[in-house]
């Protein structure tokens, strides 16, 4: 039992590292490097290829996180009865886990908006030209930038909640 629990926790942590680590790598390392890459068309190609690849990897990691998260909760004694009676939510563990789950849900929504709406729109705008496109590009970049910052903050808070649960 202990080995399987530890294995599930390890897989959960590794999937989280892939998701959050990838987000931080793109924001802190890749985007600043791409801004200096010449010619500009190469930036678009690298960003598009990387975004497409990371989108697939990150959503697989998210699926693994969700499955292992449920298994971890069950292994820690969370029951449907405790949830339905409200007993779960009155405990320290329940309050922290609920906070973590709300943050993860917010991250999932923000990630979906980024990956399936704003990110593809940004790639499309980077490929087009013209004054109107430039203004839309700047606006979209700001949205993507703020969305990434908020998601990163939520990611840090999720890790803080995980530490409090350990």
Predicted segments with their positions:
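Polytopic transmembrane helical bundles with strong interfacial aromatic enrichment
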Residues: 1-166
């Amino acid at each position: 039992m202990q080995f399987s629990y530890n294995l599930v926790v390890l897989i959960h942590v590794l999937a989280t590292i892939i998701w959050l680590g990838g987000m931080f790598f793109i924001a802190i390392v890749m985007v600043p490097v791409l801004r200096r890459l010449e010619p500009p068309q190469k930036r678009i190609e690298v960003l598009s290829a990387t975004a497409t690849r990371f989108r697939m990897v990150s959503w697989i990691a998210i699926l693994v996180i969700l499955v292992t998260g449920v298994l971890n909760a069950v292994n820690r004694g969370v029951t449907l009865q405790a949830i339905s009676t409200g007993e779960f939510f009155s405990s320290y563990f329940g309050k922290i886990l609920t906070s973590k789950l709300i943050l993860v849900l917010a991250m999932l929504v923000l990630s979906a908006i980024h990956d399936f709406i704003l990110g593809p729109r940004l790639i499309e705008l980077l490929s087009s030209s013209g004054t109107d496109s430039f203004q839309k590009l700047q606006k979209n970049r700001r949205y993507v930038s703020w969305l990434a910052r908020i998601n990163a903050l939520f990611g840090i808070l999720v890790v803080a909640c995980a530490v409090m649960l350990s």
